[in-house]
Every structure is written in C-alpha cells, then in structure tokens.
C-alpha cells in the first residue's frame, strides 16, 4: 500500500488550499489514479488500523438496496449517522441507485443484478458499468455519491474493477473505498467463476482536510506491512446472499489507529 502513502505525500507537497462545503478547508489535487494487483493480497491500509466491520457491513447494506442507517446501527456501524435524518433515512443514495434506479418508463433497474449476469453472458462487453450519479435525484440525497460509478473488465479469466470518485477524503474515506471495492470485486468474481485482477481508483478532487494534516504526516512515518488475505468461506446462491460471517481477513497486522474528525 505504498502507493497510498505516496498519494498522501503528493497532496501535502502539491495540494492547493481550497474552501469547501464543510467549512473545514482542504489541501487538494485534481485527477489522481492508484492501481492495486489483487493477486498480491487484500488492499487494506496497514499504516493505521481500519475498522473492517464497518467496511463489510456498509457494502452488504449497499447491496441490500437499503438507505436507512438502522441496519448499520444494529450491527455496530455508525459511519453514516452524521448524514441521516431523525428517522435514519438518507434519501436515494448508493443502495437505491445500485438496486432500484428509476427509469423514464417508471420501472426500476437493478444495476447490480444486471452487471453480474452480463459479466457471465458477455464478459468482453465494454458496458459492464454501474452508476450512482442519478442527476434527477441528487437533491433528494443527504449526500450525493462521492464514488459515483464503477466498471468491470474481464481478461485472461480475471475480473478487474475501476471506480470513479468525484470527491476523495484521502485520510479517512479512501482507505475504506479501496477495501470496499476490493471486496466487491472478489464477491462478483466468485459469483462469475473468475479470479481477481486489478483494482483501479480514479479520483477527481483528491484532498486532505486541514484537520487531518498532522495525522497524515504521522502515518507517513510508518512503514507499510505485508497485505492480508481475504478468505470467502462459501459461495452463496447470488451476490445478494453474502453475510458478514462469510468473510475472513487473514494476517492483518496494522499499526495503531489514528483518530481524525469527520467533516460533515
């Protein structure tokens, strides 16, 4: 995960100061890419400890099509609480767009079910794409999608994934995003009887919040450790039937947690 540390260095050295919606302010660079070979291990940042439970449950929540934080809270995950309304609702965010995009004809489109079946039917397709950026519903979302689209690519029996992100909280958010899309790629690869290939991140406004700068500098003093491995204990009937206990991260030996405030 040295490439992640190099991105932190890039922002600290080359970032421009920008004001932002949260009022905190950022150091920002534009247009960056990271690549991870999933054959080399599961890309969990090791220079600080990540809350794996939150990463797994959030992805399962997305795949359920759920947009209320109740399921997350019941499973000890609070990462979406700051944006939810008094009833726990977040509007038509990721889960709604992934599982029930509203078409012009009034019908809903399950993009996840479609892309899994299309990978099986037509792995050479250049349309293996899922989007969460529904312009017609952005104003109804408590937080418009930061990671707004992802695309799959099949070659030599391996499934690769590239996701696009308009806004990147590099210290707190990006390590979660990397692990989440790695997990999704492993799950879909298993469902399609493929091995895993590359994971590619493409970011637009890639930033460090000004109240994360010292934490980033501390992280840069730490040496990366070997990547863990992901074990999926069973193959469920569909992409929607995975459970938390199906996943085991083996050999994760991170440096201690580095706390930082969330910019809301």
UniProtKB/Swiss-Prot annotation:
<feature type="binding site" description="in other chain">
    <location>
        <begin position="207"/>
        <end position="209"/>
    </location>
    <ligand>
        <name>dUMP</name>
    </ligand>
</feature>
<keyword id="KW-0489">Methyltransferase</keyword>
<feature type="binding site" description="in other chain">
    <location>
        <begin position="166"/>
        <end position="169"/>
    </location>
    <ligand>
        <name>dUMP</name>
    </ligand>
</feature>
<dbReference type="InterPro" id="IPR045097">
    <property type="entry name" value="Thymidate_synth/dCMP_Mease"/>
</dbReference>
<protein>
    <recommendedName>
        <fullName>Thymidylate synthase</fullName>
        <ecNumber>2.1.1.45</ecNumber>
    </recommendedName>
</protein>
<dbReference type="GO" id="GO:0005829">
    <property type="term" value="C:cytosol"/>
</dbReference>
<keyword id="KW-0545">Nucleotide biosynthesis</keyword>
<dbReference type="GO" id="GO:0032259">
    <property type="term" value="P:methylation"/>
</dbReference>
<keyword id="KW-0808">Transferase</keyword>
<comment type="function">
    <text>Catalyzes the reductive methylation of 2'-deoxyuridine-5'-monophosphate (dUMP) to 2'-deoxythymidine-5'-monophosphate (dTMP) while utilizing 5,10-methylenetetrahydrofolate (mTHF) as the methyl donor and reductant in the reaction, yielding dihydrofolate (DHF) as a by-product. This enzymatic reaction provides an intracellular de novo source of dTMP, an essential precursor for DNA biosynthesis.</text>
</comment>
<feature type="binding site">
    <location>
        <position position="263"/>
    </location>
    <ligand>
        <name>(6R)-5,10-methylene-5,6,7,8-tetrahydrofolate</name>
    </ligand>
</feature>
<comment type="similarity">
    <text>Belongs to the thymidylate synthase family. Bacterial-type ThyA subfamily.</text>
</comment>
<feature type="binding site">
    <location>
        <position position="51"/>
    </location>
    <ligand>
        <name>(6R)-5,10-methylene-5,6,7,8-tetrahydrofolate</name>
    </ligand>
</feature>
<feature type="binding site">
    <location>
        <begin position="126"/>
        <end position="127"/>
    </location>
    <ligand>
        <name>dUMP</name>
    </ligand>
</feature>
<dbReference type="InterPro" id="IPR036926">
    <property type="entry name" value="Thymidate_synth/dCMP_Mease_sf"/>
</dbReference>
<dbReference type="InterPro" id="IPR020940">
    <property type="entry name" value="Thymidylate_synthase_AS"/>
</dbReference>
<dbReference type="InterPro" id="IPR000398">
    <property type="entry name" value="Thymidylate_synthase"/>
</dbReference>
<feature type="active site" description="Nucleophile">
    <location>
        <position position="146"/>
    </location>
</feature>
<comment type="subunit">
    <text>Homodimer.</text>
</comment>
<dbReference type="GO" id="GO:0004799">
    <property type="term" value="F:thymidylate synthase activity"/>
</dbReference>
<dbReference type="Pfam" id="PF00303">
    <property type="entry name" value="Thymidylat_synt"/>
</dbReference>
<dbReference type="GO" id="GO:0006235">
    <property type="term" value="P:dTTP biosynthetic process"/>
</dbReference>
<dbReference type="GO" id="GO:0006231">
    <property type="term" value="P:dTMP biosynthetic process"/>
</dbReference>
<dbReference type="InterPro" id="IPR023451">
    <property type="entry name" value="Thymidate_synth/dCMP_Mease_dom"/>
</dbReference>
<keyword id="KW-0963">Cytoplasm</keyword>
<feature type="binding site">
    <location>
        <position position="169"/>
    </location>
    <ligand>
        <name>(6R)-5,10-methylene-5,6,7,8-tetrahydrofolate</name>
    </ligand>
</feature>
<feature type="binding site" description="in other chain">
    <location>
        <position position="21"/>
    </location>
    <ligand>
        <name>dUMP</name>
    </ligand>
</feature>
<comment type="pathway">
    <text>Pyrimidine metabolism; dTTP biosynthesis.</text>
</comment>
<feature type="binding site" description="in other chain">
    <location>
        <position position="177"/>
    </location>
    <ligand>
        <name>dUMP</name>
    </ligand>
</feature>
